[in-house]
Amino acid sequence: MRKGVVAGLCLALVVMCLYLPQPCEAQYEALVTSILGKLTGLWHNDSVDFMGHICYFRRRPKIRRFKLYHEGKFWCPGWAPFEGRSRTKSRSGSSREATKDFVRKALQNGLVTQQDASLWLNN
């Protein structure tokens, strides 16, 4: 019985060696391209038509206390002397909260009506 077990183990070892994947060359270019694509996607700048005015939005990553946050900034040069700002853990949340902050400030300064502001603040 011992010879059978040893023979079975030897056969299993030979089969495993034949079917093990062969080492291949690492594809660093594809890996680096993928990582850089993800990192550059964290920054975003755009312009939007907001209530008939050209406004701008910027989102950028920020690490605070070993956590990733997204800081958003929304401003409309030539219409409002202030800007909306936010810091959230969500990329899309940073744009939404910066816009809401801008609308709150625009309402306080009389640039928008309560009705127009409620459309943005209730969502």
Curated annotation (Swiss-Prot):
What is the disulfide pattern of this chain?
C55-C76
Glycosylated residues? N45
Q: Which UniProt keywords are present, listed alphabetically? A: Antibiotic, Antimicrobial, Disulfide bond, Glycoprotein, Secreted, Signal
Tissue expression: Isoform 1 is highly expressed in muscle and stomach, moderately in heart and gill and at lower levels in hemocytes and hepatopancreas. Isoform 2 is mainly expressed in gill, hepatopancreas, muscle and eyestalk.
What GO terms describe the biological role, i.e. biological process, of this protein? defense response to bacterium
- Keyword Signal on this protein? yes
Q: Per the annotation, which location comes first and is thus the protein's main one? A: secreted
Question: What range does the record give for the signal peptide?
Answer: 1-26
Question: Subcellular localization, per the record?
Answer: Secreted
- Any single Pfam family the record assigns to this protein: Anti-LPS-SCYG
The conditions that induce or repress this protein are given as: By injection with live V.alginolyticus. Isoform 2 expression is highest 24 hours post-injection. Expression of isoform 1 and isoform 2 is reduced at 3 hours post-injection, increases to a peak at 12 hours post-injection, and returns to control levels at 32 hours post-injection. Isoform 1 expression is up-regulated at 3 and 24 hours post-injection and reaches a peak at 48 hours post-injection.
**Quick one: a GO cellular component term?**
extracellular region
Protein task: May bind to bacterial LPS and thus specifically inhibit the LPS-mediated activation of the hemolymph coagulation. It has a strong antibacterial effect especially on the growth of Gram-negative bacteria.
- What's the protein called, per UniProt? Anti-lipopolysaccharide factor
